[in-house]
Amino acid sequence: MPTGLGYDFLRPVEDSGINDLKHYYFMADLADGQPLGRANLYSVCFDLATTDRKLTPAWRTTIKRWFPGFMTFRFLECGLLTMVSNPLALRSDTDLERVLPVLAGQMDQLAHDDGSDFLMIRDVDPEHYQRYLDILRPLGFRPALGFSRVDTTISWSSVEEALGCLSHKRRLPLKTSLEFRERFGIEVEELDEYAEHAPVLARLWRNVKTEAKDYQREDLNPEFFAACSRHLHGRSRLWLFRYQGTPIAFFLNVWGADENYILLEWGIDRDFEHYRKANLYRAALMLSLKDAISRDKRRMEMGITNYFTKLRIPGARVIPTIYFLRHSTDPVHTATLARMMMHNIQRPTLPDDMSEEFCRWEERIRLDQDGLPEHDIFRKIDRQHKYTGLKLGGVYGFYPRFTGPQRSTVKAAELGEIVLLGTNSYLGLATHPEVVEASAEATRRYGTGCSGSPLLNGTLDLHVSLEQELACFLGKPAAVLCSTGYQSNLAAISALCESGDMIIQDALNHRSLFDAARLSGADFTLYRHNDMDHLARVLRRTEGRRRIIVVDAVFSMEGTVADLATIAELADRHGCRVYVDESHALGVLGPDGRGASAALGVLARMDVVMGTFSKSFASVGGFIAGDRPVVDYIRHNGSGHVFSASLPPAAAAATHAALRVSRREPDRRARVLAAAEYMATGLARQGYQAEYHGTAIVPVILGNPTVAHAGYLRLMRSGVYVNPVAPPAVPEERSGFRTSYLADHRQSDLDRALHVFAGLAEDLTPQGAAL
């Protein structure tokens, strides 16, 4: 049975013990003993985190130190390690449907016995892909594009003839690369026996591995090179490059009885003075092509990576290879890994003629990964892999369970008392006795809910008095309540705006404001965050439209304050309305805590003011305030208000009480801002990118979503709770922690948190991550 190199190639791999591979051999025979097929299997631990190009080696090391098992799994793989042929050698191609299911069953049993997490049948070529898919998909496998290889079909009798197929521009660099002797004084030896050089080869190869950023490579040792020389004598050749007698690079190639010539490994001394100019990799490719031609080989397989240089070789083409994957027990992990590999494995930059074909294959594999048909609306659920990837990696930390009230500290299930740096209860009123008692009394008096829309049977005198108090608090004629802050934005904006209108938004507005704009059917456009020059250009460009500027007063992820004074001026100048979301400013900023608009002296110029009760006002719900006709219009046309049950009595009463306490105890505003500034200053001194903008929110920027999630878990297990932030909440480069503070934070708890942060500074700060 043809097997590319032949299975004896694997003897050097076994003898050298590289990567602690455990080897198995599969044979499928007929009843009379005639072989049908055979395959090489091996079990190996693989670090999938090395395929994440956005996760630097320093970050990866940090996460591994915290969570040693992060993205490291044992794979039971079927393949020849060289990617030169399909993983299963068959007596006849027609035997595939008989043998492959048996192989998959044997792998399943081996994985169970071996403790492997994943099964992988790798390096299936495009020609056989559909048949493998038809057999393996019903068995729970999913396909993924693997590392693409570069091949060239040899149809020339000499290197000179091959070069003659190229343009002068492409031919010249290849031709001159062979002049390394004349130009740099480099000598090359062609060796069939090279065991004595094994230590040098391992050292030069390690330079390549150290610089590689594409995936976890095999860990070749001197024993491997010595075993290759011993077992592959007459079927391998080493080119050893020397400069002034010292080995500086090598290329090791192998071949079998078939038509394939394989470029196996290479290594180089990057400190060699002519390293860049000599381009010995290009020279070695040309020497390899010459050798392959002399041996009458019809195909030179150049492996993966270094695509740019390899594609300069005459006739070189990128060949997609497909992996079939399956988790040993969990179909969700199967789908997640397949999606992650498609997302993480680097694709080569290709010429247009190759790129089009490659893209077609990529889209085909993505479609074949789907567990649901194209017409099924739930297919998007099957396609996502962000949060399932966190679960697979063991760093999923959403929905932590707390077992007590949120004060300076909070009780977390299985973790005990931890410092809370991730609450929106800025004034600390959610546990204030007066607020708690008001909530309890309202429940006793009115019951737990109103069981109806505010428009009909859901309005209590408690709701009416709260609306009046809020309107008075903000100096607006009227206010209307909604059941949540999110609903408040949806109700107001979708009622006020319609098709043909223009909504102008800050690029970093809260998600609810964008959802509201989409729900309204209006057009909307963005201006760069707090960039008033850009806003002015947008207003000039949209002159003549019915427009409204929609903006957060304090931005929930950044803690920055909108330039509301300039916004008010621009709105007046261009005849535009302004809608401001004061959710994170009310209670904290401005006279009596009336928000950023009041602090900047422009509250009266804000056409519509929205606020929420789930932050400073210790409850749940939201409201919209403005001129009475505007508010009345929202009352009757805001779907989030009309078609939702009204605010529970307990929530309305708690908000009433919180408003009273916040005005009676103004020092709470000073305390929360002092706590935020203290922590921002302390974190910055430790080297963190911690930003203070005069609000209760202090973002800590890390720059990588995975690090943000892992760091969040590490902090929580060290006794400090922060909120992890990552896309889509923030741009990827702003991933990190959102810390926020409350007036009741004890100094001892803040110092305890700083102590924990200090212990992680070497891992999490830019200076530490670079080490």
Curated annotation (Swiss-Prot):
Top-level division of the source organism's lineage: Bacteria
Binding site residues for substrate: 407, 510
One Gene Ontology cellular component annotation held by this UniProt entry: peptidoglycan-based cell wall
Enzymatic class: transferase
Positions of region (Unknown): 1-418
Keyword field contains Oxidoreductase: no
One GO BP annotation of this record: biosynthetic process
Binding site for pyridoxal 5'-phosphate: 485-486, 556, 581-584
Membrane-spanning parts: none
Assigned EC number: 2.3.1.47
Keywords: Acyltransferase, Pyridoxal phosphate, Transferase
PTM-bearing positions, type N6-(pyridoxal phosphate)lysine: 615
KAPA synthase, as annotated region: 419-771
Functional note: Catalyzes the decarboxylative condensation of pimeloyl-[acyl-carrier protein] and L-alanine to produce 8-amino-7-oxononanoate (AON), [acyl-carrier protein], and carbon dioxide.
Family to which this protein belongs: In the C-terminal section; belongs to the class-II pyridoxal-phosphate-dependent aminotransferase family. BioF subfamily.
Entry protein name: Putative 8-amino-7-oxononanoate synthase 2
